[in-house]
Design a protein with these regions (language model features):
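Acidic donor-binding loop of glycosyltransferase active sites
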Residues: 102-113
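Conserved catalytic-core segment of nucleotide-activated headgroup transferases in glycan assembly
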Residues: 30, 36-75
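A short, well-ordered alpha-helix in the C-terminal region of glycosyltransferases
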Residues: 171-183
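A nucleotide-sugar donor-handling region in carbohydrate enzymes
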Residues: 1-49
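Nucleotide-activated donor-binding/catalytic signature segment of Leloir-type glycosyltransferases, i.e.
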Residues: 77-93
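Catalytic binding pocket for nucleotide-activated donors in carbohydrate/polymer assembly enzymes
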Residues: 116-160
């Protein structure tokens, strides 16, 4: 569908590798062997100038599940420490990040590359669009079961909505997560390139 939605003006002499089978997944994700724990992985990315991390954790303060949240901002890290059941990953190394993601039972993430990595790990994910370019892709993430649900921070009740969706997804017995992201995206790209130069 990417061809219809985003690449309407393709040039005939170009080859576009579109679709989930071309999503490259970092080798650290493919090699990870983490044990699942009852925890929520939260990654909003960037500098979080809107303090969304704090609002999000506050909205989940009554959800008795450990929360692992990634933050690069020292001030936000100090504010997050006052909440119980919260572990802050401050500027984590890649391997720490991957292990935290892989060991979680549910995730909250921006609509970004991290969502594809979470889908590869089969982690049900609630996505939040924090930028205009992310809003465009939200419908596709949901339609193709890359993410389990979506929260719009433009909705005045988004915090209650988030709490409700986290509880529903956490206690849901099974999740329909797209199987097309299989870690072979890089191989598929290389194969297509080799076919073109034959």
């Amino acid at each position: 569908e990417a061809g219809k939605t985003f690449y309407k003006h393709r040039k005939e002499n170009h080859v576009h590798l579109l679709g989930l089978k071309y999503i490259p997944i970092r080798s650290k994700f493919i090699d990870v062997g983490a044990t699942k724990k009852e925890q929520i992985f939260i990654m909003l990315g960037g500098s979080d100038t809107a303090n969304l991390s704090l609002k999000l954790i506050h909205s989940l303060k009554d959800v008795a599940i450990k929360k692992l949240i990634v933050s690069n901002d020292s001030d936000i890290v100090n504010s997050l420490k006052k909440y119980k059941d919260v572990e802050v990953l401050h500027k984590p190394l890649d391997i720490q990040l991957v292990e935290a993601m892989a060991s979680s039972t549910i995730a909250i993430s921006t609509a970004s590359m991290g969502t594809y990595e979470l889908a590869y790990l089969k982690i049900p994910t609630i996505i939040i669009a924090v930028a205009k370019n992310q809003e465009i892709g939200v419908a596709q993430f949901i339609k193709y079961n890359i993410a389990s649900d979506f929260i719009s921070i433009k909705n005045k009740d988004w915090q209650c909505d988030l709490k409700s969706k986290v509880q529903r997804i956490f206690y849901q017995e099974s999740h329909d997560i797209n199987q097309s992201i299989n870690g072979k995206g890089t191989e598929n790209i290389a194969y297509e390139i080799l076919e073109l130069i034959k």
